C-alpha cells in the first residue's frame, strides 16, 4: 500500500501529535504533568541533537592505520603514497609499458630485491632440504636469518635422512610393513594349529545316568547320601530241648491231680 498524505492540516496534526505524546507518557508514568516531566529531563540530560537530514555531509572519516614495517629477511617492496596508484604515476606506468624495450622500469627492482624474491619462491623446496639439529638446542639462540627461523620452528627428530615434516622414508615404511606382515602370518599359522588340534582330539564319552523312579521332581544339588550296604549276618543257632521229658512230667502231673480229686470224693 502506497503512502498517502494526511487528512488533517498542520494545526490538526499538531493537536493529534500532542495528545498522542500525552497518552504515551500516561502509559508508563502517573505524575500527570507531561510538560514538567519533559522539562526536568531536558535540564538533566540536555537537548539531544536532531536527526541527520538525508543527503547531508558524511560522518567522520575512518582513520587509516599505518602499514607495519617489513620483517627482517622479507623482500623489500616499492614504497608509494596512499593516493598513488600501484606501479607509480603516469611516468612509471609508461616506463613499465616500455620495460620490454629496456625502459626505466628496470630501476624499480634492485638486484637485491630480485634475489630476495627468488629466495621466497624457493622457500618450500628449501624447507624440505633443511637438515635437523642433532642433538636439539637447549639454550635460546638469536634468529639471524629466515633459514635459521625455519630450522628452529621445525620439529626435531633423530632420523638421518631429509624429508618434510610429518613424513617418513620409503625404507622405514617398507620395514614396518614387512614386520606387520610377519606378525599376521605367525598369528594365522597359530590359529590353524589350534584348529587342527581340536579336530584331532577325540570327544569325551558321555556317561549315562541310571534312571531312578521318583526323582523326576527332585531338585538338583539336594540328593540324599546313599547308605552303605550292610554286611550279611550269620543266623544264630537255637538251642534244642528234649520234648520227651517235658511230656512225661506233664502226664505225671495230670495223673496226680486226678487221683487227688478221686480221693476227696
From Swiss-Prot:
Residues 152-168, 243-265 have a biased composition (Low complexity). Residues 44-110, 152-171, 194-265 are annotated as: Disordered. It comes from the Viruses. Residues 48-60 have a biased composition (Pro residues). InterPro entries: DUF755, HEV_TT_vir_Orf2/Gyrovir_Vp2_N. Residues 221-242 have a biased composition (Basic residues). Phosphorylated at C-terminal serines. Signal peptide: none annotated. Keywords: Phosphoprotein. This is Probable protein VP2. It comes from Torque teno virus (isolate Human/Germany/KAV/2001) (TTV).
Amino acid at each position: 500500500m502506497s503512502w498517502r498524505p494526511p487528512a488533517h492540516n498542520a494545526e490538526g496534526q499538531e493537536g493529534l501529535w500532542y495528545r498522542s505524546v500525552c497518552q504515551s507518557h500516561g502509559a508508563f508514568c502517573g505524575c500527570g504533568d507531561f510538560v514538567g516531566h519533559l522539562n526536568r529531563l531536558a535540564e538533566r540530560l540536555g537537548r539531544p541533537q536532531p536527526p541527520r537530514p538525508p543527503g547531508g555531509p558524511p560522518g567522520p572519516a575512518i582513520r587509516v592505520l599505518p602499514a607495519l614495517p617489513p620483517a627482517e629477511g622479507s623482500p623489500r617492496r616499492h614504497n608509494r603514497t596512499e593516493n598513488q596508484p600501484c606501479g607509480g604515476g603516469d611516468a612509471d606506468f609508461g616506463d613499465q609499458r616500455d620495460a620490454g624495450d629496456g625502459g626505466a622500469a628496470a630501476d624499480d627492482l634492485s638486484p637485491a630485491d630480485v634475489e630476495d624474491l627468488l629466495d621466497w619462491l624457493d622457500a618450500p623446496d628449501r624447507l624440505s632440504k633443511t637438515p635437523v639439529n642433532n642433538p636439539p638446542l637447549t639454550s635460546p639462540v638469536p634468529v639471524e636469518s629466515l633459514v635459521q627461523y625455519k630450522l628452529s620452528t621445525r620439529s626435531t627428530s633423530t632420523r638421518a635422512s631429509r624429508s618434510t615434516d610429518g613424513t617418513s622414508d620409503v625404507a622405514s615404511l617398507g620395514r614396518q610393513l614387512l614386520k606387520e606382515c610377519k606378525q599376521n602370518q605367525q598369528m594365522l599359522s597359530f590359529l590353524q594349529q589350534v584348529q587342527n588340534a581340536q579336530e584331532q582330539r577325540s570327544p569325551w564319552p558321555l556317561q549315562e545316568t541310571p534312571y531312578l523312579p521318583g526323582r523326576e521332581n527332585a531338585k538338583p544339588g539336594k540328593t540324599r547320601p546313599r547308605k552303605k550296604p550292610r554286611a550279611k549276618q550269620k543266623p544264630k543257632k537255637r538251642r534244642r530241648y528234649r520234648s520227651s521229658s517235658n511230656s512225661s512230667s506233664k502226664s505225671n502231673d495230670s495223673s496226680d491231680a486226678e487221683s487227688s480229686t478221686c480221693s476227696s470224693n
